[in-house]
């Protein structure tokens, strides 16, 4: 039987048979408005949405990133915006801060004002404070343990750290301020004592400590026990106090993140691979502390990648810093050097080392040198009469 479209009479019968859908019921509410989606219906605080919109905040961004904030019953949009405005932030900056850190609106104004006073302890002026808040809003609007944070700021100031360094800690290493101030003091004392026990001078102890802390503030989060175990492990491997102190300074305190077992495995692998004496091994590690940081499996992978490029073990031993680079970076740099006719197999590996910026700068110099004429046609010739 051929297929046919239903007639108008048949369509009417179908419509009568179909059960009508119930009308959508919306409960009136002064506190929230309902937004329907395919998967769920989120109840948002209408007053919060309206106040954020009045601040020129893109509500869509908040819904996409941290929509839960809009569900909170108690918010302080106007109060937080006013605090930022009092500091000198314009409307655009305020909107940007609230879009990227919408949880700011659930912080009590009193807590935010306390945090404001805390950050003002290390900022030169309010303009600098606003700039920091704009760059790191989440750090500023984390308002727990404020009294402990204040004690830590005062401790670091008494220790001799500059305010610009402390402000950097507040924004990028805020966890150290939540650490009990007694713990931070204890760890600083352990580091200073370790420095002196390893042969460091009393006169240079404070300078060394402040430099170490500014390079790696997270070092205070380690336990004194971990420090003792790491130092004991290195000394057990034959490293002298002077060599351990060099490693501690070069690794900027990251040395204490290494487990004794991992250190022993890396040292054993290095000694076997390079077939060196205990003394040569220690010199190699001091020259390239990364040999301690990477697991034996990573070191082996990188050595094999270098060998495939025709580089010898002797070359690697002469310039071990090359092991700080991944195989992909090594391959890329070798190709670039080969494009200049530089035979890495026969040369020194130092040209491969360094950061990306350093390598590119050296490569540009080599490139310029290669294109330079053998003589300067403009310079006058010295002719003997």
UniProtKB/Swiss-Prot annotation:
InterPro entries: MTERF (IPR003690), MTERF_sf (IPR038538)
Role this protein plays: Binds mitochondrial DNA and plays a role in the regulation of transcription of mitochondrial mRNA and rRNA species.
Record Gene3D superfamilies: Transcription termination factor 3, mitochondrial (1.25.70.10)
Cellular compartment(s): Mitochondrion matrix, Mitochondrion nucleoid
Transit peptide range per the UniProt entry: 1-35
Name the record gives this protein: Transcription termination factor 2, mitochondrial
GO molecular function, one term: double-stranded DNA binding
An individual GO BP term: regulation of DNA-templated transcription
Stored Pfam families: mTERF (PF02536)
Subunit structure, as described in the record: Monomer.
Organism superkingdom: Eukaryota
UniProt KW keywords: Mitochondrion, Mitochondrion nucleoid, Transcription, Transcription regulation, Transit peptide
GO (cellular component) term, any one: mitochondrion
Family: Belongs to the mTERF family.
């Amino acid at each position: 039987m051929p297929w046919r479209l239903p007639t108008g009479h048949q369509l009417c019968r179908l419509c009568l048979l179909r059960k009508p859908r119930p009308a959508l019921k919306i409960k009136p509410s002064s506190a929230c408005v309902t937004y329907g989606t395919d998967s769920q219906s989120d109840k948002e605080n209408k007053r919060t949405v309206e106040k954020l919109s009045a601040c020129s905040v893109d509500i869509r961004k908040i819904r996409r990133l941290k929509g839960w904030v809009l569900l909170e019953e108690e918010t302080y949009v106007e109060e937080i915006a006013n605090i930022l405005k009092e500091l000198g932030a314009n409307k655009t900056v305020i909107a940007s801060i609230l879009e990227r850190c919408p949880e700011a609106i659930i912080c009590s104004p009193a807590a935010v004002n306390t945090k404001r006073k805390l950050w003002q302890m290390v900022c030169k002026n309010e303009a600098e404070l606003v700039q920091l808040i704009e760059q790191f809003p989440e750090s500023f609007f984390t308002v727990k343990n404020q009294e402990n944070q204040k004690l830590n700021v005062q401790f670091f100031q008494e220790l001799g750290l500059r305010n610009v360094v402390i402000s950097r800690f507040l924004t990028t290493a805020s966890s150290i301020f939540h650490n009990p101030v007694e713990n931070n003091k204890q760890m600083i004392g352990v580091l200073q004592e370790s420095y002196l026990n390893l042969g460091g001078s009393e006169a240079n102890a404070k300078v060394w400590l402040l430099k170490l802390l500014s390079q790696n503030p997270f070092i205070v989060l380690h336990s004194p026990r971990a420090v003792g175990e790491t130092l004991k492990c290195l000394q057990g491997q034959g490293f002298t106090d002077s060599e351990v102190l060099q490693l501690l300074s070069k690794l900027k305190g990251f040395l204490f993140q290494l487990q004794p077992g991992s250190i022993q495995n890396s040292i054993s692998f290095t000694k076997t691979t390079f077939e060196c004496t205990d003394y040569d091994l220690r010199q190699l590690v001091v020259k390239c502390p990364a040999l301690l940081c990477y697991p034996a499996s990573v070191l082996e992978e990188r050595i094999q990648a270098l060998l495939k490029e025709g580089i010898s073990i002797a070359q690697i031993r002469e310039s071990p810093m090359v092991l700080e680079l991944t195989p992909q970076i090594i391959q890329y740099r070798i190709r670039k050097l080969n494009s200049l006719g530089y035979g890495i197999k026969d040369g020194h590996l130092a040209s491969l080392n360094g950061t990306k910026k350093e390598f590119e700068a050296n490569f540009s110099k080599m490139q310029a040198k290669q294109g330079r004429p053998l003589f300067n046609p403009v310079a006058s010739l010295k002719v003997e009469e």
